[in-house]
Amino acid sequence: MNNDSQQAAHEVDASGSLVSDKHRRRLSGSQKLIVGGVVLALSLSLIWLGGRQKKVNDNASPSTLIAANTKPFHPAPIEVPPDTPAVQEAVQPTVPQPPRGEPERHEPRPEETPIFAYSSGDQGVSKRASQGDMGRRQEDKRDDNSLPNGEVSGENDLSIRMKPTELQPSRATLLPHPDFMVTQGTIIPCILQTAIDTNLAGYVKCVLPQDIRGTTNNIVLLDRGTTVVGEIQRGLQQGDERVFVLWDRAETPDHAMISLTSPSADELGRPGLPGSVDSHFWQRFSGAMLLSAVQGAFQAASTYAGSSGGGMSFNSFQNNGEQTTETALKATINIPPTLKKNQGDTVSIFVARDLDFFGVYQLRLTGGAARGRNRRS
């Protein structure tokens, strides 16, 4: 009997949950209605509280009413100073004064309208001034483009570009003494008699290996063996690979001297003299590289002694090493490169101005022409 009662107690209700027991019972219909009513009441109360809070916030913010500008905005008129009026003999009519009893009506000015509510006074003034300037510029532009007959000028960018640059004419002249002149642009070869080292400024010397004739190629003006003296005014700078030599004067074997003042060139006429360039790389960076290596060694040692008592001394030496490396690099980084050119190398002189030998040489008949002249005489 007891077993039957226990089995009946543990039987599963067919319409209930599979895991239901005596401690879990289904809700009746009235209980479901009560639970639904409670949930609905809580939802309505939350909605009501939220709407009330929003209403309080709306009431707390002050409402500012800004008068709308119903009239169209018109910029302030530009005051143009009137021309000096002619003297009028007629009596100016008197303007009737308004009666005192009636107060004057206050017409709002443009700057007092609500459109200027959030603009400062300076901004309004500058805006009116800029509008006035723009109007004047447009009027001036219209006046410039207009002709007396009301026609529009045809000047535009294309017509301006079509006007060529007018240059002064160059008049041709004849050389006064072409037989005795070496004209500008002549390239004279020369053999160096002194080696070149650009560490210091100084003088150089070269000798002409051949005769240099005049423009007509009839008379030798600079004989073979003429010595030319030049000067190196300064050395090279970083990145330079050529040295500038200024040739001052030439002296012929017959002791005729002439001032050249012409620059140097290579065999092909390129400016400057090439040579072997020493950039002094190791002199510039060897000290800094050595100090950097020593500093790196001490930095590696400081990592092993990081927590020991000697860590402070390693850091102090490292900081001093960085300053020493920077000082050494500044002292040697600006060493200029040096160009060296050997004695006996061929250089050129680019004649920069006409050389006139008329006051030095004279022409005379020689050989058969002179004998024929004597027989005729």
From Swiss-Prot:
GO cellular component: plasma membrane
Top-level taxon of origin: Bacteria
Principal place of residence: membrane
Cellular compartments annotated: Cell inner membrane
Spans annotated as Disordered: 92-161
Family annotation (CDD domains): VirB10 (cd16429)
Keywords: Cell inner membrane, Cell membrane, Crown gall tumor, Membrane, Plasmid, Transmembrane, Transmembrane helix
Pfam families: TrbI (PF03743)
Compositionally skewed regions (Basic and acidic residues) per UniProt: 101-112, 134-145
Gene3D superfamilies hit by this protein: Type IV secretion system, VirB10/TraB/TrbI (2.40.128.260)
Keyword Membrane part of the UniProt annotation: yes
Family: Belongs to the TrbI/VirB10 family.
Name used for this protein in its record: Protein virB10
